[in-house]
Swiss-Prot record:
It is an enzyme of class 2 (transferase). Keywords: Cell membrane, Heme biosynthesis, Membrane, Transferase, Transmembrane, Transmembrane helix. This is Protoheme IX farnesyltransferase. It comes from Paenarthrobacter aurescens (strain TC1). The gene is ctaB. Belongs to the UbiA prenyltransferase family. Protoheme IX farnesyltransferase subfamily. Pathway: Porphyrin-containing compound metabolism; heme O biosynthesis; heme O from protoheme: step 1/1. It catalyses: heme b + (2E,6E)-farnesyl diphosphate + H2O = Fe(II)-heme o + diphosphate. InterPro entries: Protohaem_IX_farnesylTrfase, UbiA_prenyltransferase, UbiA_prenylTrfase_CS, UbiA_sf. CDD domains: PT_UbiA_Cox10. GO terms for biological process: heme O biosynthetic process. The chain crosses the membrane at residues 38-58, 60-80, 109-129, 132-152, 159-179, 184-204, 222-242, 254-276, 299-319.
Amino acid sequence: MTAAVSTTDTPLNASPARGSIGISRKFKAYLALTKPRVIELLLVSTLPTMIFAQRGFPSIGLILATLVGGAFAAGSAGVFNCYIDRDIDKLMHRTEKRPLVTGEVTPREALVFAWILGAASIAILWFGANPLSAWLGLGAIVFYVVIYTMILKRRTAQNIVWGGAAGCFPVLIAWAAVTNTVEWPAIVLFMVIFLWTPPHYWPLSMRYGEDYRNAKVPMLGAIAGAKVVSVQVVLYAWAMVACSLLMVPVGGAGWVYTIAAVAAGAWFLYESHALYKRAQGGDVSNKGAMKVFHGSISYLTLLFIALAVDPFVGSAIVGS
């Protein structure tokens, strides 16, 4: 890391005082540290991947173990991230109300909570699914906390490209939970999310560019002009859509998935090119950038819903 992080228990904001909040508010503060919206997005890919790998519904016990274990792993990584980044979170309007900044949770409490969630996630995946999924869960935590948060985030504009790989682990965990191995279709889904991350996150960093500049975090959307960022968004969007279609020959996907991948991909490419056109004309706005950000979430959701439905309708277009 390029910036020192205090390890004391002194809150970054003196209000509210420790012990002055009720149980309900404390619970909400702990929940906020886990970044529940990020967890929701990660879980969108987990169950559909399990269904596709099984070519049907896995057992309820396996589904619950994988979803809960995966959520705990993501939550643990989120809390560690909030703990490490609490010095810069106070400098950004987007993150200034996080519990470690307001003092609702102390750094020591957050650190203990992160370790508990991490240990619980590995145990749940190990005994509820299999050791391979547990190792992948541990890998996801380490990758997000060490590779992204501690090494890349404050040092390079490519931080979200490589650090974002941690967000691709849920599909590997899901596939491994069902098959006890990692096969090529899982790798393709991993790469879809890997290529999806930049066009998802960079428009957000355009919207909050001033925040990142104040915190000296070199997100591409904050340090490069809209023209440069929009080109990168378009390139990654095309690569993502092309990669998604590999599930047809590699994963044996059928017509439901194929139609969704083509239609949703075409729509997202249109939105990406619209952002590019506005940026090249010097007419890009925060609203336009956020439209692509929200559109990327809709794209991924539609793609994985189709992945879940596909095994129940028709057969593979190309041999399985």
